[in-house]
C-alpha cells in the first residue's frame, strides 16, 4: 500500500513523515523545505506501508516545479490513501486544497495539525 502526505507548505507533512517512517528528513519553519517527494516505509504492521512526503501545494493547479511534482504524483500514481495535513491556524486556506483532493475519488484522512496554536 502507498499513502501520500499532502497539504499546504509548512503544515507539518515532513514532521509526520519522520514520525511514521523513522526518517530524519530536513524540516524547517518556512515553506519550500521539501522540494521533491520523499519515500519511506511504515514497518509497525505486518504489511509494509510506503509513505510518500510530497512538497507543499495550495491547489492542484501548480505554479511551481514543486507543486507539479505533488500534482503529478496525486493524479498519475494514484496512492491508496491521501493523508491531508491541515494547519489549524489557517483553516480556510488549507481547506481549499482539501476540497480538490476529495474530488480525486481516493480515500482521504484529514490530519488537523498545529491545534495547540489555535
Kindly give the residue locations of the regions a language model identified.
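Conserved G1/Walker A P-loop phosphate-binding module
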Residues: 1-65, 75-77, 81, 103
Amino acid at each position: 500500500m502507498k499513502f501520500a502526505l499532502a497539504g499546504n507548505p509548512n503544515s507539518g507533512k515532513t514532521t509526520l513523515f519522520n514520525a511514521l517512517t523513522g526518517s530524519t528528513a530536513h524540516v524547517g519553519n518556512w515553506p519550500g523545505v521539501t522540494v521533491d517527494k520523499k519515500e519511506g516505509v511504515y514497518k509497525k504492521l505486518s504489511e509494509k506501508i510506503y509513505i510518500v512526503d510530497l512538497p507543499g501545494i495550495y491547489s492542484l493547479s501548480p505554479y511551481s516545479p514543486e507543486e507539479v511534482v505533488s500534482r503529478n504524483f496525486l493524479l498519475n500514481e494514484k496512492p491508496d490513501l491521501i493523508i491531508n495535513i491541515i494547519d489549524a491556524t489557517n483553516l480556510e486556506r488549507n481547506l481549499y486544497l482539501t476540497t480538490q483532493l476529495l474530488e480525486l475519488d481516493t480515500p482521504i484522512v484529514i490530519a488537523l495539525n498545529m491545534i495547540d496554536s489555535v
